[in-house]
Swiss-Prot record:
GO terms for biological process: DNA recombination. It holds the Pfam family RmuC. Keywords: Coiled coil, DNA recombination. Involved in DNA recombination. The lineage of its organism: Bacteria, Pseudomonadati, Chlamydiota, Chlamydiia, Chlamydiales. InterPro entries: DNA_recombination_RmuC (IPR003798). This is DNA recombination protein RmuC homolog. Residues 112-162 form a coiled coil. Belongs to the RmuC family. PANTHER family: DNA RECOMBINATION PROTEIN RMUC.
Amino acid sequence: MGVFAISLLSQTVCLYFTFFSLGIALGVLFSFKIFTKKLSRQHEIIRDLEHSKAILQMSLDTRRSQEQLMEEFSHKLTSVSQAFARDMKTESQEFFSEKTQAITSVLAPVHNTLSAFKQNLENFETKQAEDRGALKEQLSQLLTAEQKLERETQALTNILKHPGSRGRWGEIQLERILEISGMLKYCDYSTQTVDSSESSSRADIVIRLPQNRSLVIDAKTPFSEEYLTDNHADPTDLVKKIKDHIKTLKTKSYWDKFEQSPEFVILFLPGESLFNDAIRCAPELMDYAGQSNVILSSPVTLMALLKTVTHVWKQENLQNQIREIGQLGKDLYQRMHKLFDHFHKVGKHLGQAVHSYNDMSSSLSARVLPILRTFDKLELSSSHNKIEALSQVSTLPHSPKVPYPENDLAECLSPEASYLKPPSSNQ
């Protein structure tokens, strides 16, 4: 389409140039016609003069007296003719020079435009060739990617033709959703759990809820090979297989095999298209599943449910930490109470030691120190140090004071405190 537009534009420019040149040629022809008309008129004048000359020449025989006049007239006519010829030649040269310059000045922009158009056309063709090469390369890459996608799709189709592979695919999708939602495998859920009483009743995923409760999820992916391989397959067969699987889950009664499990099981459909096609074909499917204690779940709804469970676990962990902090505070209070008893005992013994020290100091000062000072007066000792009197200890140890009333603190840390109690099982 672009090449055709460019070709049409070039033809239009050429036609314009042809009409323009034709107009200039007609103008030159019209000017030349005027010039020829003037020249013809001059020739007529010359012929008239020559005719007059002939008449005069004929009269010259009879009128010899007029020979000199005729000769002068002849010279005058010759000079006039030559001057007229020179003037006409000069005017013709100037006229054609002006017209040539005018035509050149008019055609110069057209020439420049055509040159620029030619250059742009060459650049466009070069760019178009490069674009065609790039487009060819992109189409080749797209074809390669499409072939690769087709091979991978075919491989996935071949794998999912087997019921076991479809079940495993559903479990992998479910584990991925559990990982994204924060339900880590080592603490919040377990896979392939088998009840000890009946080994045939195996749950794909058992979500552990707070207070030792459980939530069972099944991911057996009930859809047929025809639904997988045919894009225009009738979803009626899909609905039938889902209903059959709902009946199977109802007979298994997972809620009876796991302690404190809700009386329902979640049937996970590992694709929004599966869920939407089934509900679009059978809007009553949700009610049918609910009557069998089965809840249908797509990846989006299961993600929201697991996010809620994650939040519940966070709240449960927070409550456990609060209870643990309360228990630690209670233990700390009891230990500090014991420590304060030891402080009181130490203070009491320190007070007794101070009294004993003061009694001993008084006894030494009253009975022993006077005798020792008598020895100092007798200079019996070679030491120049004198025995100083013992000082009394007047400061007694103080008992530490509890910053809060003992009864209030004991009440806050008592086992009956509300935040130290675990939530009741019926909440």
